[in-house]
Amino acid sequence: MARTKQTARKSTGGKAPRKQLATKAARKSAPSTGGVKKPHRYRPGTVALREIRRYQKSTELLIRKLPFQRLVREIAQDFKTDLRFQSAAIGALQEAAEAYLVGLFEDTNLCAIHAKRVTIMPKDIQLARRIRGERA
């Protein structure tokens, strides 16, 4: 389609000026009630998609190191007391644990999508583990 020149047209009157006056009056009265600006909110799902892209790009560990280390030591206490861990061993355990969880959540998401849902539920995790053969 060919581009056409835009020309300004004169208004033929009507109800537009009255509407404008009403909005101006409303605007003047609004700040006097407190002037609190409504905080900006993104639409549902926008932030989630941004976080997905951010975490898929990154390679850093997502679980904090010290809480994970305490958990490992607490679990190890049940098997043998006075166990010592090299920091590299804790790091390797954390890397493996996070890789496992990411894979499990990917499979869980596929189970939810298969059920025509976008929200993952405990039953999706159970199904993913059962299909993997981790739990009968």
Swiss-Prot record:
Transmembrane segments: none
PTM: Phosphorylated at Ser-11. This is required for transcriptional activation through TBP recruitment to the promoters. Phosphorylation at Ser-11 also promotes subsequent acetylation at Lys-15.
Pfam families registered for this protein in UniProt: Histone (PF00125)
Cited CDD domains: HFD_H3
Modified residues (N6,N6,N6-trimethyllysine): 5, 28, 37, 80
Annotated stretches, region: Disordered: 1-43
Subcellular location: Nucleus; Chromosome
Entry keyword annotation includes Zinc-finger: no
Modified residues (N6-acetyllysine): 10, 15, 19, 24, 28, 37, 57, 65
Positions where N6,N6-dimethyllysine occurs in the chain: 5, 15, 28, 37, 80
Record text on subunit structure and interactions: The nucleosome is a histone octamer containing two molecules each of H2A, H2B, H3 and H4 assembled in one H3-H4 heterotetramer and two H2A-H2B heterodimers. The octamer wraps approximately 147 bp of DNA.
The protein's name: Histone H3.3
Function, in words: Core component of nucleosome. Nucleosomes wrap and compact DNA into chromatin, limiting DNA accessibility to the cellular machineries which require DNA as a template. Histones thereby play a central role in transcription regulation, DNA repair, DNA replication and chromosomal stability. DNA accessibility is regulated via a complex set of post-translational modifications of histones, also called histone code, and nucleosome remodeling.
Single GO MF annotation: DNA binding
